[in-house]
């Protein structure tokens, strides 16, 4: 019996909606990364994007445990000497509610063209409304 290998044109992608209200950042990101990669499917193939589309709503109500809201820092660099910037989770979440989740999921996906294609299937919205009703997404319950 030969090992099955999924072909890109044979993959059937579904749309799911996840409500992030009250969910913990890291646990939610791990489940989303798992679904974006397609590891929940029996046809999973490492070199083929077999994942589903994920729409995350209410990310403005997402939380972190402990005192990470103040102590968790995000760093970026301008490229100039001394040009390092740091932002706490609380500040970033207040200004850009979806960015902490996006950065967490991005860190859990493969680096390279395949990982970037997987990340494009993630849609993040701060409120409860989203423009993907035409895709008829199913509700996905995540224990996070």
Swiss-Prot record:
GO terms for biological process: negative regulation of translation; translation. The keyword Ribonucleoprotein applies. Keywords: Ribonucleoprotein, Ribosomal protein. GO terms for molecular function: mRNA binding; structural constituent of ribosome. This protein is one of the early assembly proteins of the 50S ribosomal subunit, although it is not seen to bind rRNA by itself. It is important during the early stages of 50S assembly. Belongs to the universal ribosomal protein uL13 family. Part of the 50S ribosomal subunit. This is Large ribosomal subunit protein uL13. The gene is rplM.
């Amino acid at each position: 019996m030969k090992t099955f290998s999924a072909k890109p044109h044979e993959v059937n992608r579904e749309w799911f909606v996840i409500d992030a209200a009250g969910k913990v950042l890291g646990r939610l990101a791990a489940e989303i990364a798992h679904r974006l990669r397609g590891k929940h499917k029996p046809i999973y193939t490492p070199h083929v994007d077999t994942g589903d589309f994920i729409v995350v709503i209410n990310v403005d109500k997402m939380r972190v445990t402990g005192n990470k809201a103040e102590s968790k820092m995000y760093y970026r660099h301008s490229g100039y000497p001394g040009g390092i910037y740091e932002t706490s989770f609380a500040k970033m979440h207040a200004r850009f509610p979806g960015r902490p989740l996006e950065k967490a999921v991005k860190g859990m996906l493969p680096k390279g063209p395949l990982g970037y294609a997987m990340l494009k299937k993630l849609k993040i919205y701060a409120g409860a409304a989203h423009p993907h009703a035409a895709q008829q997404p199913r509700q996905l319950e995540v224990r996070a």
